[in-house]
Each structure stands twice: as C-alpha cells, then as structure tokens.
Regions:
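Conserved pre-motif I regulatory segment
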Residues: 1-40, 144
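Conserved nucleic-acid-binding Ia/Ib motif block in the N-terminal RecA-like helicase ATPase lobe
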Residues: 5-10, 63-129, 137-140
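Walker A/P-loop NTP-binding motif
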Residues: 25-37, 48-63, 79, 84-88
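Pre-Walker A (Motif I) flank of P-loop NTPase domains
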Residues: 33-39, 64-68, 114-115, 169-170
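P-loop (Walker A) phosphate-binding loop of NTP-binding proteins
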Residues: 40-43, 73
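Short glycine-rich anion-binding loops that position phosphate/pyrophosphate groups of nucleotides
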Residues: 44-45, 122-124, 147-148
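Post-DEXD/H (motif II) to motif III coupling segment of the RecA-like Helicase ATP-binding lobe
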Residues: 134-202
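Conserved interdomain hinge at the start of the Helicase C-terminal
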Residues: 205-208
C-alpha cells in the first residue's frame, strides 16, 4: 500500500492534477482482486491513468521479463500512453511498438528486457512471431479501446496474441461502448464491470 500511495503521489505531481477521480480510485481498488476488469468510459474521462496506475502497481522489480502488455488500436494512442508512462514510471523499462516505426529500433529496445510494452496489434503480433517479444512472465494484459480494435479489423491479430496466454493474472478491457458479448478469445475471469458511460456520476460495479 505504501508503494501504491507513492505511485499515486508521483503521478498526480508529474501530471499536475490534485487528486484521482472516482474511476481511477475504483480501478486501483481492484488491483489485488482476482477478477478481470471491463472498464466502460468515454474519451477524456481519465481512463488511461486509471488503468496505468493499476498496471504499475502490479509490476515487481524482482521479475525479469515482460510483466505488462497494453494493446491499443492506433499509433497515436500508443504514443499518448507512452508519453504518460514516461512521466509517471521512471525507472521502469518501457517499449512502444507500432506500425510505421523502425522495426530495427524496436527490436533493439525489446532486447533489453522491458517490463512494460505498449503497442498496436499488428506490430505486437509480428514481434511475437519473430521471437522478439516473449510473454512467459506476463502478469497484466490491457486491451485498450477494445471496441475500436475490433472495428478496425484487428480481431485475428488480437486472437493470435491473447489465445496462448494461459497464465496472465489480470486482464483489463476498456471500451467506449457496452456489449453483451465478447469474443471467446478474451477469456475474462469473473469480470467486474465498471460503467462510466452516459451521464452517471458514479459507476455501476457488476461482477459478471
């Protein structure tokens, strides 16, 4: 808890915010629970910081290897998340991978055993196929803007990445739309749904 408090203080200070909002606090409260998370929220709600704080709270300096993977639908979002991480996660090795970026440069960065990887589905899948990303130590998987990933046609790449991951301890799926069903390959474990869509001031917390 002491480490989490320090993480929150550092994030607020470096991002020039006074305190966490309700969504961010609720996300952190789920960090040690065994349930996976479905976070439904609109753009500009503080979603990125909400899941990044949870991810960072679970990273251990004692483990060598990739502990967290954040999959996003676009280069722009990958760079945005990478920028936030650079401000709040000093000392943690982070690699950002996306189409249009130098594969050679990414490969060199991946060779130094990052703890956290952010990237787009196609580029992440390609690095995995070539053995540049190994996910045997993966603890936390984030599928950010999952609805957009599907809308952009990344279902096959995402299934290729996610289906083999049998030992991931926590999955976080974010979306701006609510759906009654999810592709089977997500394989969420007793997910808790945090719903911040619409005009609600507080979330609905629904174990499903």
């Amino acid at each position: 808890m002491k480490e989490t408090s320090a993480l929150i203080d550092k994030a607020c200070r470096n991002l020039n915010i006074d305190s966490l909002n309700g969504m961010q606090k609720q996300m952190l409260e789920t960090a040690t629970r065994p349930n996976d998370i479905i976070l439904l929220s609109p753009t500009g709600s503080g979603k990125t910081l909400a899941f990044l704080l949870l991810v960072l709270s679970r990273i251990s300096p004692k483990i060598a290897g990739v502990q967290a993977l954040v999959i996003v639908p676009s280069r722009e979002l990958a760079l945005q998340i990478d920028n936030v991480l650079r401000k709040i996660a000093a000392g943690i090795k982070i690699v950002c991978c996306y189409g249009g970026h130098s594969v050679r440069e990414e490969s060199k960065s991946l060779a130094v055993a990052p703890a956290l990887i952010v990237g787009t589905p196609g580029r992440i899948a390609d690095h995995i196929r070539r053995g540049r990303i190994v996910l045997e130590t993966l603890d936390t998987l984030v599928l950010d803007e999952f609805d957009k990933c599907l809308a952009l046609g990344f279902q096959d790449e995402m299934q290729e990445i996610i289906a083999p991951l049998k030992n991931v301890k926590k999955k976080i799926l974010t979306s701006a739309t609510d759906s009654e069903s999810l592709p089977a390959f997500t394989a969420l474990k007793k997910p808790i749904k945090l719903n911040f869509l619409g005009s609600r001031k507080d979330s609905e917390t629904t174990p499903t």
